Amino acid sequence: MNKLLTIAIPTFNRAQLLDKQLTWLAKSIKGFESDCEIFISDNCSTDNTQEVIKKWQIILSNVKFTSNRNNKNIGVMGNIACCLKAPTSEYIWTIGDDDPIQERTLEYVLTTLKKHADLALMFLNFSGRQKRTGQLVVERWLNSDSDELRVDGKTVFQGYLNENFGGVLFISAAIYRTDLVQRALQKWPSATSNWASQAYWTAFCAAHGSVIITKDTYLECTMGASLLDLDPTWNFRMRYAFIPEVYIKLLKVGYPHKFCQKMIWQNFQQKTDFKILLGALKRWPFLTIKIFIPYLRFLSISAWAILFPPKQLDNSL
């Protein structure tokens, strides 16, 4: 019989953090062992990650606990996708190895999943703390005033995409219905090369069922901890390459044409947008041209989507 929930942890060369996260999980999972399974995807770590995994497999011997070690590093998004593809449980919760999670969270998640058998997506509200300074910079990331089950998942999530796109990129906050997120991976197999693909997976699930966005915060995002934060081109790539591509893909799963077009074209709404583009052109001319040409293609596709249904655009997408 399949488990209700898989708790999956993608990790790479952070054995100490993984050990700390599994310490939290060992406490939280008590009493719920029969509902859960644990999966660790090691992205070809060179530290003692494997020793940590084996240690906890012995400690948590009463829980189904499996792991995978990639033969080579397949990237952050590739390793997350590995976690999403592996489970056979009804739901999958992929958590970062460095994100602090409250002890009450797992119990709340399991209770809610049992209460709402048709749930497509649960998104846990969260706070944000800067790793370097330790300062709490965001007290509550998403503007949700209740834990109400919403059957209009697409409409609800469209509002969050418009209001706070960055918030939906936090992998540890999303609990997916497994069959839906695995369909999303099949629909867009190259999504692992897009740093914003988390938003697509989440929006895809929301478009195919009911959702819950919690009012209370249940975990904390460790900000400034990713290697991507050290890349000076990261914001430019997100703005002109990765996020626009996500909206093009969302056209195909039924998100409104005008909404997607608006979000793709928003990079030309203010004078500062042109300054960003010109600044990037001066700093990284070849990279900027390489990114901007496909962006122009996204602009044209979004414009044509107003006139033609998405099915007629499939060959272009």
Residue ranges, per PLM feature:
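Catalytic core of nucleotide-sugar-dependent glycosyltransferases
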Residues: 217, 230-259, 280-290
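Short, flexible coil/linker elements and helix-boundary hinge sites characteristic
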Residues: 26, 57, 61, 114, ...
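Alpha-helix capping and helix-coil boundary motifs
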Residues: 75, 150-156, 193, 250-258, ...
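A general structural signal for short secondary-structure boundary/capping elements
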Residues: 169-174, 239-240, 260-270
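Membrane-interface aromatic/basic loop that binds lipid-linked glycans or pyrophosphate carriers
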Residues: 263-317
